[in-house]
Amino acid sequence: MLGAYLPILVLVAIAVIFGLCSLVFSSLIGQKKPSVVKLAPYECGCEPVGSARERFSVKFYIIAMLFILFDIEAVFLYPWSVLFKRLGMFGVMEMGVFIVILFVGYIYVWKKGALEWE
């Protein structure tokens, strides 16, 4: 039973060993000369404007949550589409209810004005 998982275990062990060796060798061999320029934040080749400790609008978080919901929707729709023919009418009805609930949620968010920027 465990023999089937042996290749995966070996692959994980090799990945962990490689990662740890990379960290150890880079800390031993790498240069340790910090300077003001090296410690400055880097932003797309431009000088950073303002502080990184600013507050963000709640709208950004709402959009992020909607994006996560969209990703979860895609995660549920993909296996359903792969097994579409095997699930039969019950699977179609179940996914239809799921899509309707999501659609109602998106309409609610839209009507509340969460997607509008002012």
From Swiss-Prot:
As recorded in UniProt, its EC number(s) are: 7.1.1.-
Q: Which Pfam family is one of those matched by this entry?
A: Oxidored_q4
Q: Does the keyword Cell inner membrane apply?
A: yes
- Presence of the UniProt keyword Cell inner membrane in the record: yes
Role, per record: NDH-1 shuttles electrons from NADH, via FMN and iron-sulfur (Fe-S) centers, to quinones in the respiratory chain. The immediate electron acceptor for the enzyme in this species is believed to be ubiquinone. Couples the redox reaction to proton translocation (for every two electrons transferred, four hydrogen ions are translocated across the cytoplasmic membrane), and thus conserves the redox energy in a proton gradient.
Where is it localised? Cell inner membrane
Recorded GO molecular functions are: NADH dehydrogenase (ubiquinone) activity; NADH:ubiquinone reductase (non-electrogenic) activity; quinone binding
| Topology term for the membrane | Multi-pass membrane protein
What's a single GO CC term here? Answer: NADH dehydrogenase complex
Give me the reactions it catalyses: a quinone + NADH + 5 H(+)(in) = a quinol + NAD(+) + 4 H(+)(out)
Key words of the record: Cell inner membrane, Cell membrane, Membrane, NAD, Quinone, Translocase, Transmembrane, Transmembrane helix, Transport, Ubiquinone
Quaternary structure per UniProt?
A: NDH-1 is composed of 14 different subunits. Subunits NuoA, H, J, K, L, M, N constitute the membrane sector of the complex.
Instruction: Please report the name of this protein according to its UniProt entry.
Output: NADH-quinone oxidoreductase subunit A 2
Q: Mind telling me which residue stretches traverse the membrane in this protein?
A: 5-25, 60-80, 87-107
Query: From which organism does this entry originate?
Result: Geobacter metallireducens (strain ATCC 53774 / DSM 7210 / GS-15)
Q: Which family does it belong to?
A: Belongs to the complex I subunit 3 family.
Give the matching HAMAP family: NDH1_NuoA
